[in-house]
């Protein structure tokens, strides 16, 4: 019987922390059979970072060069990512527990095709501005889990985290977003536990 692999999309603007999030999560979730697909426009930079820094072997990481608009590769024409998923499935005999699929850095409106992924995480960072949650981008609104990263930078960029929380609560439930600082692992455990409970249904 073929195992049901959960595909988790990870989206967010350039520099928000998508790749670092995957590096942290794959280390913490090493009890599972994991693989990662990264999307970059013209390089495989994120895949190379994970191959060097994560706990995954290189054959568990595929870098997709999307060219053009990264949004298209996760929604309108996701053929390259479908192909990468199938490659990983065949490589590991359809026995993977989770495939994380990281989008290329894109704008606040970027969303994944529901045919491509089962669940989505969208991540922004405080340095992009306190007003980002107020902009109500579809990536934030439609994702299953929303992360606000780099909380340590708030005093330096004049961002009020309480205001960001209030603005986020206009669009999301309290239990579906988490503040993080991935550089020092703040709340990474909470993100992992949220994924295990809500995406992998481990508590059922």
From Swiss-Prot:
Cellular component terms per the entry's GO annotation: cytoplasm
Please tell me where this protein is predominantly located.
cytoplasm
What top-level branch of life does the organism fall under?
Bacteria
- The residues listed in the UniProt record as binding GTP, with positions renumbered to this chain, are 12-19
Disulfide-bond pairs as recorded? none
Query: HAMAP family annotated for this entry?
Result: UreG
Annotated function: Facilitates the functional incorporation of the urease nickel metallocenter. This process requires GTP hydrolysis, probably effectuated by UreG.
The UniProt entry's sequence similarity note says: Belongs to the SIMIBI class G3E GTPase family. UreG subfamily.
Cite the record's note on assembly. Answer: Homodimer. UreD, UreF and UreG form a complex that acts as a GTP-hydrolysis-dependent molecular chaperone, activating the urease apoprotein by helping to assemble the nickel containing metallocenter of UreC. The UreE protein probably delivers the nickel.
| The protein, known as | Urease accessory protein UreG
**What organism does the UniProt record list as the source?**
Streptococcus thermophilus (strain ATCC BAA-250 / LMG 18311)
Lineage of the organism: Bacteria, Bacillati, Bacillota, Bacilli, Lactobacillales
């Amino acid at each position: 019987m073929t195992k049901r692999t959960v595909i988790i999309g990870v989206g967010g603007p350039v520099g928000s922390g998508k790749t670092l999030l995957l590096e942290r999560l794959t280390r913490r979730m090493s009890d599972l059979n994991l693989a990662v697909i990264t999307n970059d426009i013209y390089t495989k930079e994120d895949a190379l970072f994970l191959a060097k820094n994560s706990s995954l072997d290189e054959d568990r990481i595929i870098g997709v060069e999307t060219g053009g608009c990264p949004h298209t590769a996760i929604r309108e024409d996701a053929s390259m990512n479908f192909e990468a998923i199938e490659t990983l499935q065949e490589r590991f005999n359809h026995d993977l527990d989770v495939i994380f699929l990281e989008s290329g850095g894109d704008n606040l409106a970027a969303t994944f095709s529901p045919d491509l992924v089962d669940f989505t995480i969208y991540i922004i960072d405080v340095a992009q501005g306190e007003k980002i949650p107020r902009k109500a981008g579809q990536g934030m609104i439609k994702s299953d889990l929303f992360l606000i990263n780099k909380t340590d930078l708030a005093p330096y960029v004049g961002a009020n985290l309480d205001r960001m929380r209030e603005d986020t609560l206009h669009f999301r439930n309290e239990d579906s977003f988490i503040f993080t600082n991935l550089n020092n692992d703040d709340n990474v455990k909470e993100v992992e536990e949220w994924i295990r409970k809500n995406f992998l249904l481990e508590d059922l």
